[in-house]
Swiss-Prot record:
Higher taxonomy: Eukaryota, Fungi, Dikarya, Ascomycota, Saccharomycotina
Location within or outside the cell: Cytoplasm
UniProt-recorded name of the protein: tRNA wybutosine-synthesizing protein 2
Record note on disruption phenotype: tRNA(Phe) from mutant shows accumulation of 4-demethylwyosine (ImG-14) and absence of wybutosine.
Pfam short name (any one): TRM5-TYW2_MTfase
InterPro entries associated with the record: MeTrfase_TRM5/TYW2, SAM-dependent_MTases_sf, TRM5-TYW2-like_MTfase, tRNA_wybutosine_synth_prot_2
Recorded family membership: Belongs to the class I-like SAM-binding methyltransferase superfamily. TRM5/TYW2 family.
GO cellular component annotations of the record: cytoplasm
Organism: Saccharomyces cerevisiae (strain ATCC 204508 / S288c)
Gene: TRM12
Major subcellular location class: cytoplasm
Catalysed reactions, semicolon-separated: 4-demethylwyosine(37) in tRNA(Phe) + S-adenosyl-L-methionine = 4-demethyl-7-[(3S)-3-amino-3-carboxypropyl]wyosine(37) in tRNA(Phe) + S-methyl-5'-thioadenosine + H(+)
GO molecular function, one term: transferase activity, transferring alkyl or aryl (other than methyl) groups
Pathway annotation: tRNA modification; wybutosine-tRNA(Phe) biosynthesis
E.C. designation(s): 2.5.1.114
Matching SUPFAM superfamilies: S-adenosyl-L-methionine-dependent methyltransferases (SSF53335)
Length: 462
C-alpha cells in the first residue's frame, strides 16, 4: 500500500455546522469517526489527504470552519480515539532549542522551525515521521545544527519521545502495551513501486535500533527472503488496534497503511454473509483485511502472501486476536499463483469438505489485475455451491475514470474477457456473470488518484 500521509481535519467553532459537514463527507465516503473536542471547538476527521482537495476547499470556505492537517500526529488506540497533543511539536522544539542556547539566534532558530517535520504517526513503540524534502531532520539546516554540535541530537530525540508519549509509568508500575513509552524515532520514506513484496527499503532510524545490527548483512538476501526465527525476533514489532482488531508488523521490513481503516470497518459492518462461509485473501500482507473477515465469522480463510516478514506479522496478529486457536486460517507463504493448487490439495486432504467461497479479497496497489484470473479460477474450482461470489478489487484510479463510470465498465469488460478464455478449459458446467455492485473510495493516493475498492458480484449459474 501507499506511504503514509496526514489526513485533513476540520476545526468547527459553530456546532450547528457539524451535521452539514459530516453529511458532506459521508456522501463522498470521506468521513472518519470519531468527532472529538479541541478546547471549545469540535474537530471532524476525514480521509482527505490534500488541503487542495475540492471538498476540503469547499468545507474550508464555510464561515466558522478551518481545514488543517493533524500536526500532532495520530496514535491508534484500542478505543479508536486519537491522542491529541494540546502543545504542538513546534512549541516543544522551540522551547528545547531556546533552553540549549539558541534563544539569541532568532534567525537560525526560525530556519530550524521552518523545516521541522510536523507530520508523523505513532505506532508504539515507534514514531514514524513522514517523508518530506522541506520539513525533515535530513534538511541541510538541521544537519548543520547537528554538525555544529549546537545541541545533542540524541538528547533532543529522547526528550521529543517523552513529549510525544501518551503517558509515563509510575515507579514500580508498567503501562499497557498500547500506552507504553515510545522508544524509537524513524523517517518513513516511500517504498519502491516496482517491489512486489512492498518492502520499506528506505526507512531511516533516527533514534533507537529498529533491528539488531549483528544480523544485518547487505549481501545476505535470506534476511529478506527466508529469515530465521532469530532474525525475526531481532526486529522491533509495532502494534495497533483498529476497530477492535490487533495488527502487528515490523516497520523495517513491511508497510502499514493507516488509511485502510475505513475499508476494514466496511468489511466488518457491510457483509453479514461472511459468517459461516469461506474467504480467500490473495494479498494478505500482515492481515489488513484477513482479520476483519475472521472477526465476522468466516468459516475458513485462505491467505496468500509472499513477504516472510508480512507472514510473521500475520501469524503474530492471529495469535494476538485469538484466531490461531480455531485453526480455520490457512496461511501460505508463496505466490498466490499457487492458490488453485493449494485449495485443490486442501479438498483432497479434507474429504467431505465443500468449498463455500463467498468473498475473494484482491487488496494490492497500484493494481490487483494479476489476481483477477486466479479469482475466477477459484470460482470454477468450487463450482455451484454458492450462487454469488463477491470479488473486492482494489486499484488506484484517476478521478475522471471514477466519475464518468469508465473504470467500473472496463473492469467488467476485462473480467468477461478473462472468463471467456478460462471457461473454455474449466467451465465445469457453470456460467459466470459479472455485475458491478459498489465502488468505495478509500483514500486519495496522489493528486486526482484514488485508492478504490470495487465490489463485483459474480453470479454463478448452471
Amino acid at each position: 500500500m501507499s506511504d503514509e500521509t496526514m489526513p485533513v481535519e476540520f476545526l468547527v467553532s459553530d456546532k450547528r455546522l457539524l451535521k452539514t459537514i459530516k453529511v458532506k463527507l459521508e456522501t463522498n465516503g470521506l468521513f472518519v469517526t470519531p468527532i472529538y473536542s479541541d478546547n471549545d471547538n469540535k474537530v471532524i476527521k476525514s480521509s482527505i489527504e490534500d488541503l487542495n482537495h475540492p471538498l476540503a476547499v469547499e468545507i474550508n470556505n464555510i464561515a466558522g470552519v478551518k481545514a488543517r492537517f493533524h500536526e500532532s500526529g495520530n496514535l491508534e488506540r484500542s478505543e479508536g480515539h486519537l491522542k491529541h497533543q494540546s502543545n504542538s511539536i513546534t512549541e516543544f522544539t522551540k522551547s528545547f532549542l531556546k533552553d540549549h542556547g539558541l534563544a539569541n539566534d532568532k534567525i537560525f532558530l526560525s530556519h530550524l522551525l521552518d523545516h521541522l517535520p510536523l507530520k508523523y504517526t505513532i505506532y508504539p513503540p515507534v514514531v514514524l515521521f513522514n517523508n518530506s524534502t522541506v520539513r525533515s531532520f535530513n534538511h541541510p539546516i538541521w544537519q548543520k545544527a547537528f554538525q555544529l554540535k549546537l545541541f545533542d541530537p540524541n538528547e533532543y530525540y529522547r526528550e521529543l519521545l517523552c513529549f510525544l508519549s501518551p503517558g509515563k509509568p509510575s515507579k514500580g508500575t508498567s503501562l499497557h502495551p498500547n500506552n507504553r513509552l515510545l522508544t524509537h524515532l524513524a523517517i518513513n520514506n516511500p517504498i519502491t513501486e516496482a517491489d512486489v513484496l512492498r518492502r520499506p527499503f528506505n526507512i531511516q532510524p533516527l533514534y533507537g535500533k529498529l533491528i539488531d545490527d549483528s544480523i544485518l548483512d547487505d549481501n545476505d538476501n535470506t534476511l529478506w527472503e527466508n529469515p530465521s526465527q532469530e532474525q525475526l525476533n531481532s526486529s522491533i514489532w509495532c502494534k495497533v488496534i483498529q476497530n477492535g482488531v490487533t495488527q502487528i508488523w515490523s516497520p523495517v521490513f513491511t508497510m502499514f497503511s493507516r488509511g485502510n481503516i475505513k475499508e476494514k470497518k466496511r468489511v466488518l459492518t457491510t457483509f453479514p454473509d461472511i459468517c459461516n462461509n469461506d474467504v480467500v485473501d490473495l494479498y494478505a500482507g500482515i492481515g489488513y483485511f484477513t482479520f476483519s473477515y475472521l472477526t465476522k465469522g468466516a468459516r475458513t480463510l485462505f491467505a496468500f502472501e509472499l513477504n516472510p516478514w508480512s507472514v510473521e506479522g500475520l501469524k503474530r496478529g492471529l495469535k494476538a486476536n485469538g484466531f490461531n486457536k480455531s485453526g480455520n486460517c490457512h496461511v501460505f507463504q508463496e505466490s498466490n499463483e499457487m492458490c488453485v493448487q493449494r485449495l485443490t490439495e486442501f479438498l483432497s486432504q479434507n474429504p467431505g469438505f465443500r468449498l463455500r467461497i463467498r468473498h475473494i479479497n484482491l487488496g494490492l496497489l497500484p493494481s490487483s489485475k494479476q489476481g483477477w484470473p486466479l479469482a475466477i479460477k477459484l470460482i470454477y474450482l468450487q463450482g455451484a455451491s454458492l450462487e454469488k461470489v463477491t470479488m473486492h478489487i482494489h486499484e488506484n484510479v484517476h478521478i475522471d475514470a471514477i466519475e464518468d463510470g469508465s473504470f467500473e465498465k472496463n473492469v467488467i469488460v476485462e473480467l468477461d474477457a478473462i472468463n471467456e478464455s478460462i471457461a473454455l478449459i474449466r467451465n465445469r458446467g457453470i456460467k459466470l456473470q459479472f455485475v458491478r455492485s459498489k465502488l468505495e473510495r478509500i483514500k486519495t493516493f496522489a493528486p486526482d488518484i484514488w485508492h478504490v475498492c470495487v465490489d463485483v458480484d459474480v453470479i454463478v449459474s448452471t
